[in-house]
Amino acid sequence: MTTTNLSALADPLRLYDEVFGSRLLLGTARYPSPQSLEDAVRACGPAMLTVALRRQSAGTPEGGAGFWKMLRALGVPVLPNTAGCYSADEAYTLAQMSREVFETDWIKLEVIGDDYTLQPDTLALPAAAERLIRDGFKVLPYCTEDLVLCRRLLDVGCRALMPWAAPIGTGRGPTNPYGLRLLRERLPDVPLIVDAGLGVPSHATQVMEWGYDGVLLNTAVAQAGDPVAMARAFAMATQAGRLARLSGPMPERDVAQASTPVVGLPFWHADKNSA
């Protein structure tokens, strides 16, 4: 591998005023066991770990003091989220509680508008983001690929966005490639992390090839037959997609073009003519 390729793989993810060595963020819910979560984290080396305050109770496998102690031991920055909130006020309150519990200004902002699709509430989301940003939070809003919504979130002070690929937990991959690619094209300087709906590593590679800055995963890893191996696969896929983007892929063509050029006559024609 050349020096150029090595530096491309090592290029950092920049969110707000911080730099991260990985472009993969990992959720911490629904793993078969705390040990499988710990092993998956070590396998993929994520930039951040998302944690829902509402799940941190002693009665859940991923809850309690032991879980929090394990996260601290891993040394990976924690990104609390407001999962399960259905209003701006509810999300605001939970974010404030998360700041106290996890001692961080980072928040993955979720305000759900529909129980069936878990689609973000496009009206409440900017309102909640604006209030939290005024309070000094570094807000990463879970949103759709809607360009107008994304611009509104930027207008209220968000400096990075997390559009979905598909509804949470479906594993369908990008259901609106046109919308995601258009969003990347129209917001070229904004950090964009695809959050929700990715199911297999090739989905991560695809969005990274489109120019997205990172991916956030949970169910695709936690519910895999081998979460540790899948975490490693997603890490490699994310790097591959990023490197492919930086390498400048060849343009698509409508007609075939020979990869081996033919210059002049075949050598046996030349020998025959000279005889």
Swiss-Prot record:
Enzyme Commission number(s) from the entry: 2.8.1.10
Places the protein is found: Cytoplasm
GO molecular function, one term: thiazole synthase activity
Amino-acid positions noted as binding 1-deoxy-D-xylulose 5-phosphate in the UniProt annotation, renumbered to this chain: G169, A196, G197, N218, T219
Catalytic activity: [ThiS sulfur-carrier protein]-C-terminal-Gly-aminoethanethioate + 2-iminoacetate + 1-deoxy-D-xylulose 5-phosphate = [ThiS sulfur-carrier protein]-C-terminal Gly-Gly + 2-[(2R,5Z)-2-carboxy-4-methylthiazol-5(2H)-ylidene]ethyl phosphate + 2 H2O + H(+)
Cellular component terms (Gene Ontology): cytoplasm
Pathway: Cofactor biosynthesis; thiamine diphosphate biosynthesis
InterPro entries in the record: Aldolase_TIM, Thiazole_synthase_ThiG, ThiG
Key words of the record: Cytoplasm, Schiff base, Thiamine biosynthesis, Transferase
Pfam families: ThiG
GO biological process per UniProt: thiamine diphosphate biosynthetic process
Top-level taxon in the UniProt lineage: Bacteria
Top-level EC class: transferase
Active site: K108
SUPFAM superfamilies membership: ThiG-like
Function recorded in the entry: Catalyzes the rearrangement of 1-deoxy-D-xylulose 5-phosphate (DXP) to produce the thiazole phosphate moiety of thiamine. Sulfur is provided by the thiocarboxylate moiety of the carrier protein ThiS. In vitro, sulfur can be provided by H(2)S.
Assembly notes: Homotetramer. Forms heterodimers with either ThiH or ThiS.
Protein name: Thiazole synthase
Source organism of this protein record: Ralstonia nicotianae (strain ATCC BAA-1114 / GMI1000) (Ralstonia solanacearum)
Lineage of origin: Bacteria, Pseudomonadati, Pseudomonadota, Betaproteobacteria, Burkholderiales
The gene coding this protein: thiG
